Every structure is written in structure tokens, then in C-alpha cells.
Amino acid sequence: MATLADVARKAGVSKSTASRALSGHGSVSLATKKRVAAIAKEMGFVASSAAESLATGRSKNIALVTPFVNRWFYSEVIDGVEAALIGAGYDLTLYRLTDNEEQRRALFDYFLVRKGVDAVIALTLYITDDEVARLDSLGKPIVGIGGKIPGVSTFFIDDRVVARRQTEHLISLGHTRLVHFGGDLEHQLDFEVHAGRLKGFRDAMERAGHSRDNDFVAVDVSTSGGYEAGMRVLADPTNRPTGIVAVSDEVAIGAMMAAYRLGLSVPGDLSIIGIDGHPLGEALGLTTMVQHVSKQGAIAVSQALALLGGMSASDDDDLAMELPVDLKIRRSTGPVSV
């Protein structure tokens, strides 16, 4: 097997220059980098990660901390992070964090602090001031996805605004009897997405003069949760809404399945709109608010690498970036039936 010394000898450079050329660290001309990289590839040389870590002080490993791995939104973000890290030559270490306080302390006191990760990406998790300071003191930058965290570079969508726009689309089609299928307000993640989306729904209904009782149904945020709620809410024709504003595409798809099971036409009898951009939504003709989920992972990786490269934000306004969300109109929404 070829060694670094073999590559350096063939390239006509010193061993240290060859190391810098392959690691991307230090002052080496572009021509030399290309020549050394080509020779290393030709000779089948693969740099030792341990040796590179000793030379650069970096592990080329970034941690992603998430509360879920099996929900569609989270798995899509994780896929986006992984693809971007592989493209940049980095490894991914994945930690699933529950609401167990002992587990959280172990994660921040040991795994993220003492283990060899260069940066941390927090997915829909609020990082406390003490946790931020602890990682910052060790030169481990943090990037957040899902909400604002003081002192941390974050990317998020405005859930209240998105839900308001979602609801306004159905109102513009003449709907007045709308119900929000949302997440349980008693069991929310750190950034209270469920509450934000319910507020946005009610903002739109109040502005249009359509506020009503029994406008909210708490559901499990899943396809089965949407289906079960749909079967309950849509079964009574005397009190049936003309539209459902769903907290996610998965819930919307479940509600659509319930409507079909009950013999209802979508959108003839019932209009349904979701949030996310789930690929099944396109196949089913679901109108939705597309939040470009996988791109969020790639954006977070790009920011983490920029911070590792020495970039810093000048103030808190620079640290929080609102991401675009686009209304995608498909077959599941239409004018209210007269």
C-alpha cells in the first residue's frame, strides 16, 4: 500500500507539503494540490483519518443531534446533511436526544465535548446558553435548524406565517368552515411548532371573520393520526367542515384517505392542504406549503463548514435566517361546494 512518503516522492514535494495538499489546510498552490491529489489517486493512497486529525486538529466529523430519526421531515433533513457532508469529505455522527435530562447531560458533558466532532448541528432542539458556551469554549461551532437560538447560527421557517398562508388559500376559495388538524399542544418540541401553526390558522380565520368553535383537532403527527382524526371529524355530515388545514403533509394524506374511505370527493366535498413537500403529496395531488426539507440539511452543513473556516456573524440578526416556503397548488383544494 502506498504511503504519504511515496506520494510526496513521486510528486517531487516534501512530505509536509503533500500532507497539506491532500488535507486542504495550509498554504499550497492550486497546481500542487491538483498534482498531489492526482498522484495519490493513481497510487491508491488513502490518508489515515487519525494522522490527518493529528496534523490539522480536526476530525472531519460533524455531529447531528435530533429528537427523531423515523419521521419523514427528520429523515429528509438527515439525508440532506449526510449528502452534503459526504460531498465535503466529512463523516456524520448521529445522536438521537429524548427528553431524558440525564441523557441530555451525558450528551453535552461527554459525547459532544470530549468526542472528536468538529461542529454540532441541532435539529429542532433548543440549545441552552450554558451548552452553547461549553461547546463554544472548545471551538465547536453550532448550527440550528427549526428556530432561533441566541448566539447560534440558525435556519427556520415562520410556522405562524406559513399556517396563515395555508389557511388563506382555502379562504380565498370560499371556505368558511375550516378545521385545523394539528399536533398535541401539551407535548411539543422546543420551538412549539404546533402552537405556532394553530395561531397562524386562527389569525387567518379571525381576519376573515370566520372564527368558530371546535376549530382544532389534536392529532398524532403521522399519516395514521390524520386518518383517525379524519374518520372522527368527517363522519357526521351535519357538522362536517369544508376544508382541513393540516399541520403536516403526512397528516393531510391521512385525512385524505379517511375522506375517500367515507365516500367523500376531494376537493368536491372537502379541500385539504398540508405543509412540508412530501413526495407522496405530489402523487396524490396534495396542495401544500413546500419547505424544501432536504435543502435545510445542506444549508446547515454549508454554514457549519463556513464557521469552521473562520466565518463569524456580526450580530444576532445575522445569526437567524428565515427560509422560504412556497405554496404548491394541486388537486386537493378547490372552490367550496354551494
Q: Residue ranges of each PLM-predicted region?
A:
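N-terminal helix-turn-helix DNA-binding module of bacterial transcription factors
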Residues: M1-K60, F73, M205, S337
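Alpha-helical recognition/docking segments in bacterial nutrient-uptake
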Residues: A2-A5, N61-E168, S172, N239
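Flexible loop/turn connectors
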Residues: M231-V338
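Short beta-strand segments enriched in small/hydrophobic residues
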Residues: T17-R20, A55-N70, R177-H187
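Short acidic/polar active-site loop segments enriched in Thr and Asp
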Residues: S14, K60, D118, T176-R177, ...
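Hinge/beta->alpha junction and helix N-cap segments in small-molecule ligand-binding domains
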Residues: P67-E76, Y95-Q103, F155-R165, F181-M231, ...
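Residue-level detector of anion-binding/catalytic polar loops
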Residues: V46, I86-D91, P141, T176, ...
